[in-house]
Amino acid sequence: MWSEGRYEYERIPRERAPPRSHPSDGYNRLVNIVPKKPPLLDRPGEGSYNRYYSHVDYRDYDEGRSFSHDRRSGPPHRGDESGYRWTRDDHSASRQPEYRDMRDGFRRKSFYSSHYARERSPYKRDNTFFRESPVGRKDSPHSRSGSSVSSRSYSPERSKSYSFHQSQHRKSVRPGASYKRQNEGNPERDKERPVQSLKTSRDTSPSSGSAVSSSKVLDKPSRLTEKELAEAASKWAAEKLEKSDESNLPEISEYEAGSTAPLFTDQPEEPESNTTHGIELFEDSQLTTRSKAIASKTKEIEQVYRQDCETFGMVVKMLIEKDPSLEKSIQFALRQNLHEIESAGQTWQQVPPVRNTEMDHDGTPENEGEETAQSAPQPPQAPQPLQPRKKRVRRTTQLRRTTGAPDITWGMLKKTTQEAERILLRTQTPFTPENLFLAMLSVVHCNSRKDVKPENKQ
């Protein structure tokens, strides 16, 4: 039904066109306008073909079309014929008021909106959604007024080939801006610009209702195309994943099979080497710190011992000067002490001397000092320091057996100094180093006499 009404002009021959000499006969006009109702639902310029056929006898169809609209909307609108005659290249603004009056009148009487009525047409559905056609108006056979090519050869269904591609570019863009952006990106579509400007001029009419209806028309295909796009994207992603899985799975499995073996074998070896190396470094650092501490301690002891020996030598000289009879006894004791010092000095290079711990300052015997030293907790060490201890113990026992004089120790020196201080207190002499030294000499002399007397008695 729609196709017959739309292309009715093609079937009417030129000889049967209504003449201009009967303008008053409204009945004939109404009868002739009956098959033109479906084109009235379309936009002006798309369905009527008198703009392409510039024959003189077809001017009455414009008058009849305007009369049919005016008959419904109100009083007839009579203007110049130049406003109703549309040529091939003249797209002036005189068409807009005519289209505005027709559209307003049709909206008052019709029950459905213009885009809904157009949507029911099988031929106009795609054209309203996708206004760009693969072939421009100028290239179509309708653009030539005098051509003998039939208008049936040009079908609007050709525009369906680019429907899916064009829907991706026209989702939420205004109709005027979308044409400019697409034509700027594609220089091949420069021929379609005059036709597209004509369509945008119709769309951007000053009434607000047409803008709302056009936005609704554009929203409907965008919803449909979003579903189609989602389905197509899901299918494409599934195919791509299948291809990538088939191509990459064997490579990944081979890589994992080859890479896992050396990884598990190499990982446990590294921490063992690191731990052993760290333990060795820790032990070396401990040994170095211990050796440094021992060396510093031995130096301090040697310095103190030398000072004591020097002082003791000076005291002995002063005693001999005052009492030359004490020279033999003192020399014998000093030789023994010097021999012990030499033997102990050789061992002190390896182990610190334990000479001071053998007897406390209070005069305790050597065994008690050794017991306390052995009972004290000591860190585990190598068996090297044990050998010199045994040698030293043997040496001391041998010296005790061979010598009859007692060993001079720090305890004995302390006792002599205490006795010398007592002598100075008794005599009320000042505590000067010289007086103290002399008192110590007297104490040593008295003790030596005590030790010599029992030997003479035996």
Swiss-Prot record:
Keywords recorded for this protein, A-Z: Acetylation, Chromosome, Cytoplasm, Isopeptide bond, Keratinization, Nucleus, Phosphoprotein, Repressor, Transcription, Transcription regulation, Ubl conjugation
- Could you state what the record's PTM comment says about this protein? Substrate of transglutaminase (in vitro).
- Keyword Ubl conjugation assigned: yes
| Regions of compositional bias (Basic residues) in chain numbering | 388-398
Residue location of crosslink Glycyl lysine isopeptide (Lys-Gly) (interchain with G-Cter in SUMO2): K109, K160, K180, K199, K227, K235, K240, K328, K453
Which stretches are tagged as biased composition: Basic and acidic residues?
A: 1-18, 63-107, 116-142, 181-194, 217-230, 237-246
* Short name of one Pfam family: Periphilin_C
Post-translational modification Phosphoserine, affected residues? S110, S114, S133, S140, S161, S167, S197, S201, S205, S325
Tissue note: Ubiquitous.
Which residue positions does N6-acetyllysine occur at? K235, K240
Q: Where is the composition biased (Pro residues)?
A: 377-386
Tell me the compartments it is located in: Nucleus; Cytoplasm; Chromosome
Q: Name one GO cellular component term.
A: cytosol
Q: Where is the composition biased (Low complexity)?
A: 143-154, 205-215
Positions occupied by motif Nuclear localization signal: 103-109
User: Which InterPro entries does this chain map to?
Assistant: Pphln1
A molecular function (GO) held by this record is: RNA binding
In residue numbers, the region (Disordered) covers 1-51, 63-284, 345-406
The subunit field of the Swiss-Prot or TrEMBL record says: Homodimer. Component of the HUSH complex; at least composed of TASOR, PPHLN1 and MPHOSPH8. Interacts with SIN3A and HDAC1. May interact with PPL.
Q: What does this protein do?
A: Component of the HUSH complex, a multiprotein complex that mediates epigenetic repression. The HUSH complex is recruited to genomic loci rich in H3K9me3 and is probably required to maintain transcriptional silencing by promoting recruitment of SETDB1, a histone methyltransferase that mediates further deposition of H3K9me3. In the HUSH complex, contributes to the maintenance of the complex at chromatin. Acts as a transcriptional corepressor and regulates the cell cycle, probably via the HUSH complex.
Q: Which PANTHER family match?
A: PERIPHILIN 1, PERIPHILIN-1
Which protein, by its recorded name, is this? Answer: Periphilin-1
Q: Which species is the source of this protein?
A: Homo sapiens (Human)
Q: Which gene encodes it?
A: PPHLN1
